[in-house]
Amino acid sequence: MVHGDLLYHDGLFFSAKKEDGTYDFHENFEYVTPWLKQADLAIGDFEGTINKDHYLAGYLLFNAPVEVMDAIKEAGYHVLDLAHNHILDSQIEGVISTADIIEKAGITPIGVYTHEPRDQAPLVIKEVNGIKAALLAYSYGFNGIEQYISKEDYNRYLSDLNEDKMKAEIERAEKEADITIIMLQMGVEYQLEPTEEQKALYHKMIDWGADIIFGGHPHVVEPSETVEKDGDKKLIIY
C-alpha cells in the first residue's frame, strides 16, 4: 500500500498541541489506520523534516514536532520516502535527524543516505510474502537550498535525478530483488497531466528495470498507465 504526502502544515501543529506543550497527532490517522494495518507493506511519503534543534515550521519550510513519528508508527507504516523537495528545509542536520528518528521508530527511510554515501549504500530490499521488493526514491530538486550545502554533502546524502546513478541503481535492483518499486518526486504542482519530461523519464526507468513507479509532487491525481515489457506489465502512476 502506497500513498502520497504526509505534509505537516502549522495548522496541524496547533490542533495537535496539548496544554502541557507536547503534541499528539494520533487523531490524524484515525480513519486510515485500519487500512494501513491490513497492508503487507505500507509506504508513505514524509514530506518535511523533523529536527529538534531547528524551529518548527509549516510553510514554506517544513519542520515538524518529533511526536508526529509516534502517530505515524502507530498508524502502521513500514517505509517512509524522504526523497522530496523539502528534505533540506532544516539543512543537512535535518536530513540526518529525520532519518534517525524514523529508524528509531522501527520504520525504514528511503531516498536519503545517512549511513553510507549514496554510491556505497546497500539497496533497501523488503521481503514481503516471499517476494523481495527493492525500494528506490528520487527527487527532481530541493527548492534551491542545495546551493547552500557542499557538493560532497549533496552527493553523499541526497537522491536526485542523475540518470547515470538512477540507471545503475535500478539495474542493480533488478539483479538483487524480484520487483523494483520507485517513489519519484517530479512534475508540476496542481497540474492534472504529466509533463513530457515525466513521461520520458518514467518510461526510461521501465526500460532500466523498474516494475512499479509511484509519482508524487503534483498534489493532485494524475493518470496511470501500464507498459508492456518483456511479456510483463509494468505500472506507472504519474
Show which residues each predicted segment covers:
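Acidic, metal/ion-coordinating pockets
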Residues: 1-238
